[in-house]
């Protein structure tokens, strides 16, 4: 599956990495797993509710998640937030 990102995601990602440079490798690893196996247990992939009902979320570390949409053969990353923020 192809990965695409929103400008909102890109801005938030840059901020998170600037605060914590070790995140870059963790994020790359989880994205690689996502592309190869959506059902891998380390992702903790799940559908969201409420305002983000059309989105999914997967785990990066601790309380950090990436939210995304699945559109045809594209995974669109929409945000990188803590669990409390969604």
What would you call each of these model-derived segments?
Residues 18-40:
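A short, compositionally biased N-terminal segment around positions ~18-40 that is enriched
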Residues 2, 11-16, 21-25, 58-86:
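Enriched for short, Lys/Arg-rich terminal
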Residues 33-58:
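A short, surface-exposed loop/turn module that caps and links secondary-structure elements
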């Amino acid at each position: 599956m192809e990965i695409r990102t929103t400008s909102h995601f890109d801005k938030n990602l840059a901020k998170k990495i600037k605060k914590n440079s070790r995140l870059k490798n963790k994020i790359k690893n989880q994205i690689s797993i996502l592309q190869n196996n959506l059902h891998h247990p380390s992702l903790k992939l799940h559908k969201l509710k409420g305002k983000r009902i059309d989105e999914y979320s997967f785990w990066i570390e601790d309380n950090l998640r990436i939210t995304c949409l699945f559109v045809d053969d594209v995974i669109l990353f929409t945000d990188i937030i803590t669990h409390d923020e969604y």
